[in-house]
């Protein structure tokens, strides 16, 4: 066979001129650009395109699925999958538990009957594998740059930025205002969703790269922002948005009215929070759902404490009844029945009323859909199309929420239908505690105000640079978003900072167009059952802050990895070789994964059969059919 293949990296401009259709991740051009020649095009899968942290999802799934094909042990394949995953996201176990997985909404498998690949479950499994194996993050260079970078905040954005910069040989110091790391991951997400030991282990892995950590250190109090800029070659601001928004209605300054951010912070910090028997949560976002479900668990703890005290009284009464039994069995039988009924009643919590008020319908709720469903299953009551207009107070404490019914009108700027008050529909919801989960804003430290916009968010350009040279920012401090978005911001900001420290011009990263399901042969893929994580029973979940779900088992993970359709990259299905009428295609596993197929162009007649047979959209004809 005459080898005429070359591997080229093609610029966006050249590629658009030649293809006129899509931007590829990488093209393997074989035998020139004739329209008759099969061209192997490694394209961006839609899952990665939808992932805010740009994880190589296809890469780590197919590494596991094809382990046997490349004669790797399962352990070796999982180790490699972990390395691929953590190249972009150093907190896989964490995000495998909390991420709303937009990647799954992008997955092309959703267009089949068996649904999207359970990417989030796989991320959690791979992350846990890394922790169980005590795998360590590796530096990209052993040479230190001599440059120092200050990272303000140890939330997902700050941790991600510190991780990437440390791998590149820079000396990184994290300044954290709280007593522990994690930002909203620790102080805003309940432990039943994210256990503290999981977060601690992944943060420690980042620190083990040589990152210095200074907790209980607030910029503006312990060190000025100006001094910080002088002492470090670059500064990344990842402060997050820890201040809960308020509604500006009468009575919200009452002692028993909290924002969701402050409420969750207190609970997660271990502070005792008394909420009483009737809790009202205002809002339909993630913080509101977390606050509602945490309230239910706090009430269960109070109920358990009371039940324990009453159980002691029950035991004493039962002993007295047993003594009576020696003389009057009939009377004692009645007393026993009454006592047992009373004890059963104690098991039903009277501290179980948590009500969520939301001004639109459930379909418009911005919270993670899964969390809304779980909240309903746990017994949380939803008052939809309901807006608070005031707070009823008595002696400086809130006793109720004044509400009005709403109806939906025309869509607003967000695309959701605008809620309109219904005249004469006012009513009051009684409460012992009110929690407002309507949003959060940053608390900028002294000296940072000049970097903010008129709404109080830090302003950055597309490379995450502020108007001040050497100062960069990302994560919730520039606008609220999900945690993986903050991880992506931290990584991209680190890329900018690295170029800045080296005096390099940063080339703009161009977004590739993902392969669509309509460009694939979907009929090739047989139905395969999706592998779901197991949940603990609701009655147990609502009485504990222990994790409510279990990581999938190895057999499930292996099966789930094989559900990946490897969109845009060869997975050695052999269809092209089987159907080639000229027997011009051969396969060799000595080549890298994804590039095992090879065309002998001395035999190829350009019939397009390989292109039509390829299920994953990898084979194009020439420079675009």
Residue ranges and their predicted role:
Residues 80-89, 122, 185-233, 368-381:
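N-terminal Rossmann-like dinucleotide/flavin-binding domain of flavoprotein oxidoreductases
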Residues 255-279, 306, 312-322, 391-393, ...:
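FAD-site-proximal beta/loop scaffold in flavoenzymes
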Residues 147-173, 288-295, 341-342:
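N-terminal Rossmann-like FAD-binding beta1-loop-alpha1 element of flavoenzymes
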Residues 170-186, 307-321, 325, 355-362:
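Glycine-rich FAD pyrophosphate-binding loop
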Residues 291, 297-307, 336-351, 484-509:
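Internal hydrophobic alpha-helix adjacent to the cofactor/substrate pocket in enzyme cavities
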Residues 90, 155-156, 180, 285-287, ...:
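Residue-level detector of alpha-helix initiation sites
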Residues 217-233, 393-426:
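Conserved beta-strand-loop-beta-strand element in the redox core of flavoprotein oxidoreductases
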Residues 1-148, 196, 237-253, 393-398, ...:
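Ferredoxin-type iron-sulfur electron-transfer modules and their immediate structural context
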């Amino acid at each position: 066979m005459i080898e005429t293949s070359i591997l080229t990296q093609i610029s966006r401009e050249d590629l658009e001129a030649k293809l006129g259709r899509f931007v590829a991740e990488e093209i393997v051009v074989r035998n020139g650009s004739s329209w008759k020649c099969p061209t192997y095009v490694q394209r961006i899968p839609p899952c990665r395109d939808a992932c805010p942290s740009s994880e190589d999802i296809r890469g780590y799934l197919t590494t596991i699925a094809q382990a046997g094909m490349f004669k790797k042990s399962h352990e070796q394949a999982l180790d490699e999958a972990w390395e691929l995953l953590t190249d972009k996201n150093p907190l896989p176990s964490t995000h495998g538990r909390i991420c709303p997985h937009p990647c799954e909404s992008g997955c092309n498998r959703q267009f089949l009957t068996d649904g999207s690949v359970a990417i989030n479950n796989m991320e959690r499994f791979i992350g846990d594998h890394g922790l169980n194996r005590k795998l360590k993050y590796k530096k990209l260079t052993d040479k230190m740059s001599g440059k120092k970078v200050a990272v303000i905040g140890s939330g997902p954005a700050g941790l991600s930025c510190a991780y990437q910069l440390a791998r590149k040989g820079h000396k990184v110091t994290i300044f954290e205002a709280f007593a522990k790391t994690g930002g909203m991951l620790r102080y805003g997400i309940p432990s039943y969703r994210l256990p503290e030991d999981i977060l601690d282990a992944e943060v420690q892995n980042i620190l083990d790269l040589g990152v210095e950590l200074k907790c209980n250190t607030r910029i503006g109090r312990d060190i000025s922002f100006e001094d910080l800029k002088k002492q470090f070659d670059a500064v990344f601001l990842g402060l997050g948005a820890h201040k809960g928004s308020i509604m500006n209605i009468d009575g919200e300054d009452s002692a028993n009215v909290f924002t969701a951010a402050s409420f969750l912070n207190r609970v997660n910090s271990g502070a005792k929070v008394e909420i009483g028997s009737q809790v009202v949560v205002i809002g339909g976002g993630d913080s509101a759902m977390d606050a509602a479900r945490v309230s239910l668990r706090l009430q269960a703890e109070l109920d358990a404490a009371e039940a324990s005290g009453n159980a002691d009284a029950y035991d004493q009464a039962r002993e007295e009844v047993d003594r009576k039994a020696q003389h009057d069995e009939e009377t004692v039988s009645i007393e026993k029945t009454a006592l047992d009924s009373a004890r059963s009643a104690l098991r039903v919590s009277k501290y179980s009323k948590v009500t969520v008020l939301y001004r639109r319908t459930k379909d418009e709720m911005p919270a993670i859909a899964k969390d809304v469903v779980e909240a309903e299953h746990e017994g949380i009551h939803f008052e939809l199309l309901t807006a608070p207009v005031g707070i009823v107070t008595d002696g400086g404490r809130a006793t109720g929420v004044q509400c009005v019914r709403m109806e939906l009108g025309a869509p607003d700027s967000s695309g959701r239908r605008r809620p309109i008050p219904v005249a004469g529909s006012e009513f009051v919801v009684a409460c012992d505690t009110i929690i407002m989960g309507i949003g959060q804003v940053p608390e900028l430290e002294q000296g940072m105000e000049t970097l903010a916009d008129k709404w109080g968010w830090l302003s950055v350009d597309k490379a995450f640079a502020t108007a001040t040279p050497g100062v960069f920012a990302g994560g919730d401090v520039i606008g609220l978003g999900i945690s993986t978005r903050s991880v992506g911001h931290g990584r991209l900001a680190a890329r900018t900072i690295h170029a800045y420290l080296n005096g390099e011009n940063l080339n703009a990263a161009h977004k590739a167009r993902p392969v669509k399901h309509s460009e694939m042969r979907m009929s090739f893929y047989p139905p395969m059952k999706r592998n779901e994580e197991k949940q603990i029973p609701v009655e147990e979940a609502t009485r504990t802050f222990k994790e409510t779900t279990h990581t999938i088992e190895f057999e499930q993970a292996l099966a789930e990895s094989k559900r990946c359709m490897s969109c845009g990259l060869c997975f050695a299905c052999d269809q092209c070789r089987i159907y080639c009428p000229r027997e011009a295609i051969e396969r060799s596993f000595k080549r890298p994964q994804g590039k095992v197929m090879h065309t002998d162009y001395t035999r190829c007649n350009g019939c397009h059969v390989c292109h039509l047979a390829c299920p994953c959209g990898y084979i194009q004809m020439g420079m675009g059919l």
